[in-house]
Amino acid sequence: NPANPRYINAVEIYVRDLFTRIGNSSALCDVVIYNEPVYNASVHESCNPMWQNFLQNKYKDISAVNTAYGANYGSFEEISMPKEVSGEKIFGDYMQFNDEIMSELHHTVSEYIGKYTKAFRHTKVMQYIRPYVGGERLNKSNNYELWANAFDVNGCDAFSAQAQEEHIPLYAKAAWYDYMR
């Protein structure tokens, strides 16, 4: 669970220990912070209080949630994260919640690394732009727009859009450039 403070603390210790040793090496030119990072908070019951707090901050009042969802919840504590992809409003809120967890993680880890090295920081994300795996976007927390300013450069993994399949439309091939800074 990347939102767990113990996980964040472990990452901070790892980054500090690693980059105090190699951070100023002339051989280090870049740091790939994550390789195809994904997260699905709904598989962690420990995230339910965070989810409920997210909803409370967004809607302020349980009646507003009930109106938005067409539901009849008595309190925010009754609302669990959806387990399946759906077109319902609750799933849109879940996507936003899940995306924010990973975005915060990317920004935090990038900031930690930036304390110890001047190497370029980036992440490898482009796999899930491909149209035929678009469902991955719905439940894997990969909203690149939220992450972009955490890194020195974005994109750069165009294998799937540039050379693999002839049937991939131009917009997917051009998407690679949209994530560059």
Describe these PLM feature segments:
Residues 1-173:
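Polysaccharide-binding and catalytic clefts of secreted carbohydrate-active enzymes
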Residues 174-181:
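Short, intrinsically disordered, charge-balanced linker/junction segments flanking boundaries
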